[in-house]
């Protein structure tokens, strides 16, 4: 199996409800290691840049407004098949369709405020990690 890195966001709704620790526990229980983490309050420019691929979609303005509404936690996770493993832990984008026991089923209220984001591919993960973290901020776990 391949050791990969993936990018994750705990969104403003889950941060506001103090779910950070519970969500981190889910990552670690699944064998994903947190190798970088920080709290950020995105500016409009940062949010628009991060979600630029959605700029022509009808939900873009609401997404940017939501993602700038409060602090978020951004983290880089490392582990075997990390991209897929993380997405499985998150559950379906729409919490109404998310499997029982997933982060979105347990912590999200709606498709718009769905608790967390996860990279959808290794290429996306690399781009998203670099958007928030310098190489020096990544701390591979050696123990």
From Swiss-Prot:
Keyword hit for Kinase: yes
Subcellular localization, as worded in the UniProt entry: Cytoplasm
Annotated Gene Ontology cellular component terms: cytoplasm
EC class: transferase
Catalysis: reaction(s): a 2'-deoxyribonucleoside 5'-diphosphate + ATP = a 2'-deoxyribonucleoside 5'-triphosphate + ADP; a ribonucleoside 5'-diphosphate + ATP = a ribonucleoside 5'-triphosphate + ADP
Active site (record annotation): 117
Cofactor(s) the record lists: Mg(2+)
Pfam families, per the entry: NDK
SMART domains assigned: NDK
Binding residues for ATP: 11, 59, 87, 93, 104, 114
One of the GO BP terms on file: CTP biosynthetic process
GO molecular function: ATP binding; metal ion binding; nucleoside diphosphate kinase activity
The entry's keywords: ATP-binding, Cytoplasm, Kinase, Magnesium, Metal-binding, Nucleotide metabolism, Nucleotide-binding, Phosphoprotein, Transferase
UniProt cross-references to PROSITE patterns, sorted A to Z: NDPK, NDPK_LIKE
Gene3D superfamilies: Nucleoside diphosphate kinase-like domain
Highest taxon of source: Bacteria
Cleavable signal peptide: none
Enzyme Commission no: 2.7.4.6
Family annotation (NCBIfam families): PRK00668.1
PANTHER family to which the protein is assigned, alphabetical: NUCLEOSIDE DIPHOSPHATE KINASE, NUCLEOSIDE DIPHOSPHATE KINASE DDB_G0292928-RELATED
Quaternary assembly: Homotetramer.
Cited function: Major role in the synthesis of nucleoside triphosphates other than ATP. The ATP gamma phosphate is transferred to the NDP beta phosphate via a ping-pong mechanism, using a phosphorylated active-site intermediate.
Recorded family membership: Belongs to the NDK family.
Name by which UniProt lists this protein: Nucleoside diphosphate kinase
Originating organism: Shewanella halifaxensis (strain HAW-EB4)
Biological classification of the source: Bacteria, Pseudomonadati, Pseudomonadota, Gammaproteobacteria, Alteromonadales
GN (gene name): ndk
